[in-house]
Each structure stands twice: as structure tokens, then as C-alpha cells.
């Protein structure tokens, strides 16, 4: 089955220097993939020619990449309302329009998160039964019994700072559907992020959401989960409001940088004698770093829309942006918006 994805080629901190090499690698590895690069035609063509020569991309592969001109770009610090009202020919807006027109199956952007969410909601609209879309991200999770690395989906990560219990309930349904499709499990475990595991703890909206989940046969509700267990693979879906989710995600990113800095500092300050066993352990450190590498988990989905939109980290590398493209492909294959719609019709 073939699939086509539009890419906001100008979006993100690094723009074409990230999106073009990522697109080339993705189409080279997946013969079923076609990509439409949206943005300044001249700049994209020039970058495409340069990177295709560096990567030695053959003509049959290049023929699966098209360029769609857009005259404007959305800045990383631009107001979402301005992006929606005034930037109607931005690379972001045009890339999303292609999803609406069914010219492509999904859109991937590393652009301004607020603008992407506002534009996506304005153009694509939400699925019936969904009040607001949510940003969901796959986090690394380690199973202490099997010693295997897995994924836990967490939402919302910043789209909705304040949420009602009904909205948290909707997020749980959407996250459960994504986890079931992505992880290939029939009944994903769903948990609410809270300050404790006891039933009486937490804000009223969280406690009321718990009651809704307990009464829903569709959801395999796993109770509350504390922040210290996020990486323990004790659940498949973690639900929270966008404020808590965004703070949690950025705290995780900062923690990983701290660990990496401490390891480097320890190595640099070690004596020559101590560096010998450290050098011998380098393969272990490299393997550990690979497991902690957030590039392999890049690609946050905007769940609850009638079309597929995947948000890459703004400062993502080419490898990380490529991962976001594969996340979009996965959602295309499982037709996530349609599955969410059908499930909500049964539950609500």
C-alpha cells in the first residue's frame, strides 16, 4: 500500500537542513512512500539537489518527492492566532490543507507547536465527540522483569493547559486506541498521572475522570500513576492535562542532559588508571545512550483531528525528523482518526 505525506519543509529551528535529508532518507528506505515538500520552491529545490548528491540518491527515489510552493513561513515564536488569520499561504498551513483535500494522507511539521495545533484544528476540525485535540508522545519505558525497552504513550503534552474530567476521559480513549494499534496489544493499560496512587488524592477533575474510566468497559483502567513510575513500563498510556504533561516532558529532557553531562564530567576528571576500565566500558555507555536517545522517540501526534498531523521537536536532527515521518506512516496504516471516531461512537 502506498502513502503520501506532506512535510512543512520550512518549519523548525533548522528548517531545510533537517527536513530535506530526513525526507530523502525516508523515501530511500520505504519504496511505498511519497513525500510532498511544502515551502519556498527555489530554496527547497536547491537544498534537494545538494543533499541528494551528498547522499547519492538515485533518480527513481527522487521521483517520489514533489515540491509544493508556499510563499510564507510561520516563525517559531509567532502567535497562533496570527498564523491562522494572516499566514494563509504558509508552508505549515498549505501542508495541512493538503491533508484536508486528501491530496496526502498525513502531515509532519517541526514548526511552532501552538500555531500547528491552532491551524490543524481550524483546517481539519476535531472528530465528533472530541472537545479538543491532544498532543501525545511515546516515552521510553523499561520493564524491570523482562529487561526490555518499550514505549509508554503520554498525553496531553501542552495543547490544553486546563482540562475537564470529560476531556481527560476523551484523551484516555484516544491514547488507548493509538497504543493498541502501535504496540499490537488488545487492551492497553491506561493510567491517570497523579500525586499519589490513593483514590482520595488529586484534583477534582482527576478524581472525576477516574470514575468515568472505571465505568467504561472499553478502557483497561490501571488506576493512578506517580511521576516516578513513568519510565517503569507499568502502563501503556498516561493521561494528564497539558500543563503537567509539558512540564513533565521538559523535566525528562533536562534530566537526560544532566545524566549525560555528569558521565562526561566523571570521565574527564578521572585519572589515567581509572580511564582504562572506562574505555573498556565504552560499548556499554554507547548502548545505554542509544536507549536514552530521544531522537528514536521523536514525533508527537495531534490526536482528535479528522486527519493525521505529527509534530516533530522544533530542534530535531535529521534522524529525529525521519522518526517523526515513520510515526505518521504508522498512523496512516492503522487509520487512527477513523478508529478513534468509531470507538467514540460506541462509548459516548
Curated annotation (Swiss-Prot):
One GO CC term, this protein: cytoplasm
InterPro entries: FA_synthesis, Phospholipid_synth_PlsX-like
Catalyzed reactions per annotation: a fatty acyl-[ACP] + phosphate = an acyl phosphate + holo-[ACP]
Domain of life assignment: Bacteria
Keyword Cytoplasm annotated: yes
Subcellular location: Cytoplasm
The keyword Lipid metabolism appears for this protein: yes
Physiological role: Catalyzes the reversible formation of acyl-phosphate (acyl-PO(4)) from acyl-[acyl-carrier-protein] (acyl-ACP). This enzyme utilizes acyl-ACP as fatty acyl donor, but not acyl-CoA.
Protein name (record): Phosphate acyltransferase
Species assigned in the record: Francisella tularensis subsp. holarctica (strain LVS)
